[in-house]
Amino acid sequence: MGLDKACGVRNNARVANSSSTKLLPHTVVALVKDRPGVLQRVATCCGEKGFNIRSLAVGSSEQAGMSRMTFVVDASTDAEVMVAELKKLEDVSEISDISSQEFVSRELALVRVQGGKEARKRLLDIVDIFHAKIVDVAPDSMIIEVTGHENTIDSLVRLLKDYDVVELVRTGRVSMLRGA
């Protein structure tokens, strides 16, 4: 089915982020065909329906020729509308909103921080507290890697703001249902 039929047209889209609607993060996991244009079609469909993608991670899956996609959208209780529309795309094999179920969720961040010897000692203490790793050291900077729940990464980043954060990159959430 074409994108226009699956997602409608922009001026007919129902906007989920109207001021009268309380938005909640919804974690959606999909198994999609691993071919060019799939990510664009999924993102366009979400946008056409008025859903903002806050986080997105896509990578290889356990099935050859398929990718696993995890994305977080801001939505009210009508996230099922978006999931139903995405199911209509021929590239989407499986999709579900797992927000109401028990799931494991992780994110990775790399943070480049500048600092001399004195700052490094304090930074190493912070790295240890968060079970993070130093993955690169240069004369005036280091790169810290942290993996964990979104809140853990947010907390580490807040603490590092007291230092000279030169660069920050985050992967976005990856998630799996518990015990499935």
Question: At which residue positions do the language-model features occur?
Answer:
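Long, contiguous binding/interaction regions
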Residues: 2-68, 72-180
